[in-house]
Amino acid sequence: LDAYDEQTLDLFVNQPLSGTTGFSSLYINAGRMSNKGLELNAKVDVIRGRDFGVTLGLNHSYNKNTIEDLGAVNEFFLGTFVIRKGLSYGTHYTLNYLGVDPATGNPRYEAPDGSIVNDQAKAGQFDKFGNYLPRHQGGVDFEIRYKALSISGLFSYQFEVQRYNNI
C-alpha cells in the first residue's frame, strides 16, 4: 500500500489567445496542482505445486487532484473541459441543461441572467459535470500454470469517470 501527496508546479498549459494576436494559443508554465491518493497492489499464489500453480493479483488506485493556482489567469477552456482553481484537472463543462420542457418537449437551459430558455444559442451559463480522468482504476489478474504451459488474463476497471461526446 502506497500513499502520496504531491505538488506539481509550473503546469505546462496551452493557453488560448485572442484571434487578434495572429495565434490561436501559447504554451506557458503556470500554476500549481496537488495530487493525493492511494495505490494498492497484492498478489498471492493460490496453488503452488511443482507442476501446477494458480496466481491471483489485485491492484487499485485512487487519485484526487485539485488545481490550486493558475497564476494571473482565472481559468482556461480547452475543448470540453475547464481548468479552474478549485476544480480537478480534466473537469468537463457544458451548458447548464435543466431537462426537457414537459409542455413542448424542447430542451431547457439556464441563461446568464438565471432565466430558463429553450434556445441553446441564448443559453450561456456553463456548468461542470464530471471528469474525464478516472478517480478509481485497477485490475484483477490471474495465471494458471501446468508444467510448461501457462494461461493468464487481466480484467481492468475504472469508475468515477465521465466521457463526453461533443458532436
Predicted regions: what is each one?
Residues G124-Q125, Q137-G139:
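Short, hydrophobic/aromatic alpha-helical segments in well-folded domains
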Residues F12-L17, G37, D113-A121:
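Active-site-adjacent bridging/hinge elements
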Residues L26, I67, G138-V140:
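Residue-level marker for the onset of beta-strands and adjacent loop->beta junctions
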Residues L9-N14, I151-L154, Q162-N165:
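Extended hydrophobic-aromatic, low-complexity segments
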Residues T21-F23, G31-N35, N131-R135:
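Transmembrane beta-barrel outer-membrane domains
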Residues L1-G22, V54, S61, N65:
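Membrane-embedded beta-barrel scaffold of Gram-negative outer-membrane proteins
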Residues I28, D45-Y132, R163-N166:
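Conserved small-residue
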Residues L1-A3, L38-V46, V54-Y62, G138-I144, ...:
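Membrane-embedded beta-strands that build the outer-membrane beta-barrel scaffold
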